[in-house]
Amino acid sequence: MNIPLSDRLLACAEFVNPGDRIADIGCDHGYLSIHLLTNGIARSAIASDVAEGPLQSAMHNARKFGVADKMSFYLSDGAKNIPRDFDALVCAGMGADTMIHILEDAPWLRSKQYYLVLQCQSKTPMLRRYLSDTGWHIADERIVKDGKFLYTVMKIRWQPDAPKLTAGQCYISPAMLTRGDPELAEYYQRITDGLRLAVTHQADPEKKAILEELESLEL
């Protein structure tokens, strides 16, 4: 049976280290965990959601695909009510505000015991700024095209001594430049076009400085 995964979620799966235990926050139908288990990537999965409906759907799908014995299910607002015996925490399909709320409510995640895989839907520069300011390091970040939209998936680790991101790096991270995905040029164009539009329609010295920083990059 095929597991219906979007390109976004497939990109998240690629950032999970083989043999690790995962916690999928906001699991929806549970397909990411099921994909990781049926393909022998993860050895166990915690699936959590803030709503009962998606959690019941995830439980049904786990039984359908024969991995219910490797999964546990929790009704939880973010990571509040889940056990802590995992290696990787995955948050996908949420905006920056929600992700920041989840991280603020779980300060115990600030440990080298864990790494996080985040796929942010909106306000990604704000999320990068928050991560940098609170001791998280973006170890890897890739661009993924899903339909007509471009998203990024980042793998982050607790590293309080990591260099802080500049304002421009909150729009295009050093990890993205290092990876050099084929979609980078298009992503860069969309970001700089949006900044130019903002600068044209309103006198915003902060955005103007960010645009100048990004325009100085050699892609």
Please describe what each predicted stretch is:
Residues 3-19:
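Conserved alpha-helix/loop element of class I SAM-dependent methyltransferases that forms part
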Residues 56-84:
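S-adenosyl-L-methionine
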Residues 19-28:
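Conserved class I S-adenosyl-L-methionine
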Residues 44-49:
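Conserved SAM-binding motif I beta-strand of class I
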Residues 30, 34:
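Glycine-rich SAM-binding Motif I of class I
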Residues 51-53:
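Conserved SAM/SAH-binding beta-strand->alpha-helix loop
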Residues 105-155:
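C-terminal substrate-binding/active-site "lid" region of AdoMet-derived donor-dependent transferases
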Residues 160, 164-219:
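An accessory alpha-helical subdomain
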